[in-house]
Amino acid sequence: MCRKLYDKLYEITGAKLDFNDKNQAFILLEEQIPVCITDNDEYIFLTGLLNEHELFTENIINPEHILILNYSLSRDYGSSICLLPDTHQCVLTKKHYKKYLSPDELIESLYEFLFCIKLTIANITSEVN
């Protein structure tokens, strides 16, 4: 685990990360958007909840729309929309390799990830409504 990355996060945001036995810590960005930070030996993996509903299994949204949106997010921000296998929840993910990531870049990346989550939620919400 890369302590200096998380110390900087705490310094900037006041968010202290408590990692569980799966090397996962949970944080609320802007006090409303849940994000899981998974710390692997080589990388940090971000997972943000987009929708609590089963968008695909309940036929709420056209999968083609999600695939097109996923392409744009991947191309422009390096993020991907995924479906969690156990819960069928729609999430946004992004992987950062530690050897290329400074503490300041982690903070910047979290802000960009938050922007992508908001952008994706707005897009999905407009498509559903």
Swiss-Prot record:
Its main location: cytoplasm. SUPFAM superfamilies: Type III secretory system chaperone-like (SSF69635). GO terms for cellular component: cytoplasm. Keywords: Chaperone, Cytoplasm, Plasmid, Virulence. It is found in: Cytoplasm. The keyword Cytoplasm applies. The keyword Cytoplasm applies. Interacts with IcsB. The icsB gene can be read-through into the ipgA gene to create a translational fusion protein. The biological significance of this process is unclear. Molecular chaperone required for IcsB stabilization and secretion. This is Chaperone protein IpgA. The lineage of its organism: Bacteria, Pseudomonadati, Pseudomonadota, Gammaproteobacteria, Enterobacterales. The gene is ipgA.
